[in-house]
Design a protein with these regions (language model features):
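A short Gly-Trp-Pro
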Residues: 2-121
């Protein structure tokens, strides 16, 4: 895990925190590019799979490479969810749900504070 992370970023990545809905700086980002793990720069999502789910968090219907993430059952907050974790640094990214659009039917609901974005040249 990188050393130059803010307290908020560390809270999300290491302590499985969640940013407030509609507060993330990447929520409305419409630029073409790639989203990386803020903790280790692991390539995670493409802007091609990003969509507006209305949930308040950046949402994607698929990762660039399914092997770049790990899934873990999350029973916190009285709910059963599937946590999405960075495979390289074990950083908490968000959760995945089965209510997304075609072609996958998945909604990867990811915290902006756990992501970096690099615009395509």
């Amino acid at each position: 895990m990188k050393k130059n992370l803010t307290e908020e970023e560390l809270h999300i990545l290491k302590n499985k925190g969640t940013e407030k809905p509609f507060s993330g700086k990447l929520l409305y980002n419409k630029k073409k590019g790639t989203y990386y793990c803020k903790g280790c720069d692991n390539e995670l999502f493409s802007s091609k799979s990003k969509y507006d789910s209305g949930s308040g968090w950046p949402s994607f219907y698929e990762p660039i490479n399914i092997n770049s993430i790990v899934f873990k059952k999350d029973i916190s907050l009285g709910m059963i969810r599937t946590e999405v974790i960075c495979k390289n640094c074990d950083g908490h990214l968000g959760h995945v749900f089965d209510d997304g659009p075609n072609p996958t039917g998945k909604r990867y609901c990811i915290n902006s504070l756990s992501l970096n974005f690099n615009k395509d040249e």
